[in-house]
Amino acid sequence: MRAARLHGVRDLRVEELPDPAPAPGELLVRIDACGVCPTDVRKYLLGATAGYPLNPGHEWVGHVEALGGGVEGWEIGQRLYGDTYAGYAELAALPVEPGPWSHGPLLLPEDLPLERAIFVEPFADCLHAVIDQARIEPGQRLVVVGGGQMGLQLVLAGVLEGAEVELVEPHDERRGLGLELGAGEAVSDLSDVWGKADAVILSIGDGALVERCVELAAPGARVVLFAGFGDAPRAELDLNRLHYDEISVVGSEWIGAPPNQRRVHYGVALDALVSGRAALERLVTARCGLDGLEDAFADVQAFRGLKTMLVP
């Protein structure tokens, strides 16, 4: 099979590898598509803690080709979602039991469009940020800063939770998408936001924006740091403001969510995608093969387009 694997910082190689054989407790899956995630690009640029070689794709859809020994409840030909680091390849061996880096396979209906199906994991991630970390309640005001592919999913997650959502995003087209997804307002700069918010989610890895997000927070509000900050993870904050107004600054990282939360949010995300309440395929702006993955990473770095779907 062909696969794209990282061998070090900025060292991505498309390789011919032996087809994997499913071990006991595993499924052999032929991968139909995989979403390109900004975290994959961070691993490419800054290094991977999981070791090398690494196939960082983790938003993938495929069909079962073979069953390993002892596997029950799965059949050849079934369609599934996988979130292990294996998605940038033609084939993957997927454990059926959840592990530290995987929720386990999730059965998908055949009629769910491929461009929508790849969003199960990232949309669940956004639900975790909105529900568990921002703790937004119906009718509360949520400001999402940054309208990239994840920021727009955060907008929709907030809308589905009943929040009054405002998007801050400089690009006209992305602001328009935010309004289409249900944001009540979309402005181009933080200075255009009036009043205070019950929660602010920062979806841009720019430490200079953290203090400005805190300034927007109402007493008792939560500021959620959704993006990673790369090699510049520093910010200055008015600690008296945090103290006297009881403002919480929290992170949101899907891998850090407890397994029970992840199970719940996977189910909610899949239900929203299947029902059409989360018609996120409009965020897919490019497609590529394995040989085009490095160009797709460059597009993410340059903020070109939104979501790229890799078809191996």
Segments predicted by a language model, with ranges:
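Glycine-rich beta-strand-centered segment in the early N-terminal region that forms part
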Residues: 18-35, 45-87, 109
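Conserved S-adenosyl-L-methionine
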Residues: 160-164, 219
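Conserved acidic E/D residue at the C-terminus of a beta-strand in Rossmann-like folds
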Residues: 169
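NAD(P)H dinucleotide-binding glycine-rich loop of Rossmann-like/cofactor-binding domains
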Residues: 82-145
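C-terminal substrate-binding/catalytic core of Rossmann-like NAD(P)-dependent dehydrogenases/reductases
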Residues: 233-284
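C-terminal hydrophobic helical "lid"/dimerization subdomain
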Residues: 263-312
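N-terminal Rossmann-fold NAD(P) dinucleotide-binding loop
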Residues: 151-152
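Glycine-rich cofactor phosphate-binding loops and adjacent beta1-alpha1 units
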Residues: 134-136, 176, 181-248
